[in-house]
Design a protein with these regions (language model features):
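Domain-level signature for soluble enzymes in the chorismate/prephenate branch of the shikimate pathway
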Residues: 1-96
């Protein structure tokens, strides 16, 4: 395959990653609504450690465990941001 062929393949993979990240975020929205309803805290460090350990175990390379951890730390950070927005919006709606 040529460089352009590989780039097209990467482009398609990137599109799939975006789809999956948005699908994951939809789940996060639902979790945020449930946490708001039952009064659960936004930040749950034990759960985040569990997620990070799971993705590190699932990694078969060529990315290093450290690289996977950094990527998922960022994903989890964005997930908290989404949850925070959902929980805040739900609280705002309840106060109206």
């Amino acid at each position: 395959m040529s460089v352009e062929d590989w780039r097209r393949k990467i482009y398609e993979i990137d599109r799939k990653l975006v789809e999956l990240l948005n699908e994951r975020s939809k789940c996060v929205v639902e979790i945020g609504q449930l946490k708001k309803t039952d009064g659960s805290p936004l930040y749950q460090p034990d759960r985040e450690r569990e997620v990070l350990a799971g993705v590190e175990r699932a990694n078969r390379g060529p990315l290093s465990a450290a690289a996977i951890r950094r990527l998922f730390e960022r994903i989890l950070d964005e997930a908290r941001s989404v949850e925070r927005t959902v929980m805040h919006d739900e609280a705002k709606k309840a106060g109206e």
